[in-house]
């Protein structure tokens, strides 16, 4: 997969040069391209924003630099243009999985008070992280892109690594433990030391179900309980 990122602050995406995503780039599993919107402005002072028509606080990103940067990206990337903005659908794991199946993607990061409305006809999809305000689209783009890239086969080293993680099936992940066995008076659950893989699997499943029901009832209501789940929870099969 190739991802092109259109931004006013390219240096913010240097985080992808490290750790798992950095290794995936080195191994040619994925390709990231960062384009500076400011490089494509026709303004001699490299200005990319202006005052809003009709008045109001703040500045609005002008259409010309953005649209020309989109066109520049599309010379080598025919993927969907995804804009990080408050009008979009709330991003979730299912959306990450769907987007990970795309061959290429282009991410547009807004800034200031937003983008000129005339840019929207060049956008295929708008996503939001939630009902809160960030200082720029870059802050939202980083977790969205990371959640997509880690689903690409080979990025995590083994494809099954993400299958048991939180949200993969609307369940929070079970508790994890490592050495030492005892820490500040709290010990690792004995079942995890038993070596009985089937019992461990059932214990982990029960922990995930209980955690999700208690912490994220909004997710739990979407969970379809199996007969085994109901038995683990001590509920009657219905």
UniProtKB/Swiss-Prot annotation:
Keywords: Cytoplasm, Methyltransferase, S-adenosyl-L-methionine, Transferase, tRNA processing
EC class: transferase
Intracellular or extracellular location(s): Cytoplasm
Alphabetized GO MF terms: tRNA (guanine(37)-N1)-methyltransferase activity
One Pfam family this sequence matches: tRNA_m1G_MT
Enzyme Commission number: 2.1.1.228
Catalytic reaction annotation: guanosine(37) in tRNA + S-adenosyl-L-methionine = N(1)-methylguanosine(37) in tRNA + S-adenosyl-L-homocysteine + H(+)
Entry-linked InterPro entries: Alpha/beta_knot_MTases, tRNA_m1G_MeTrfase_C_sf, tRNA_m1G_MeTrfase_TrmD, tRNA_m1G_MTases_N, tRNA_MeTrfase_TRMD/TRM10
Positions bound to S-adenosyl-L-methionine: 110, 129-134
GO biological process: tRNA N1-guanine methylation
Record GO cellular component, one term: cytosol
Family: Belongs to the RNA methyltransferase TrmD family.
Subunit structure, as described in the record: Homodimer.
Cited function: Specifically methylates guanosine-37 in various tRNAs.
Official protein name in the record: tRNA (guanine-N(1)-)-methyltransferase
Species assigned in the record: Clostridium botulinum (strain Alaska E43 / Type E3)
Gene: trmD
């Amino acid at each position: 997969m190739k991802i092109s990122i259109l931004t006013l602050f390219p240096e913010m995406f240097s985080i992808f040069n490290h750790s798992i995503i950095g290794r995936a780039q080195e191994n040619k599993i994925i390709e990231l391209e960062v384009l500076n919107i400011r490089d494509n402005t026709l303004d001699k002072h490299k200005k990319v924003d202006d005052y809003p028509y009709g008045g109001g606080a703040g500045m609005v990103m002008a259409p010309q630099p953005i649209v020309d940067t989109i066109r520049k990206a599309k010379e080598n990337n025919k993927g969907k243009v995804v804009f990080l903005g408050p009008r979009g659908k709330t991003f979730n794991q299912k959306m990450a999985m769907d987007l990970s199946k795309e061959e290429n993607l282009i991410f547009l990061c807004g800034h200031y008070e937003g983008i000129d409305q005339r840019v929207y006809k060049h956008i295929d999809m708008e996503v939001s992280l939630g009902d809160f305000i960030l200082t720029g689209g870059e802050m939202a783009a980083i977790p969205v892109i990371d959640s997509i890239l880690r689903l690409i086969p080979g990025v995590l080293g083994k494809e099954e690594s993400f299958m048991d993680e939180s949200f993969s099936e609307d369940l929070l992940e079970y508790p994890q433990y490592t050495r030492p066995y005892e820490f500040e008076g709290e010990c690792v659950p004995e079942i995890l030391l038993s070596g009985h893989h089937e019992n461990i699997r059932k214990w982990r499943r029960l922990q995930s179900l209980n955690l999700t029901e208690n912490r994220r009832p909004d997710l739990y209501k979407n969970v379809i309980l199996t007969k085994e789940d109901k038995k683990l929870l001590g509920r009657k099969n219905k």
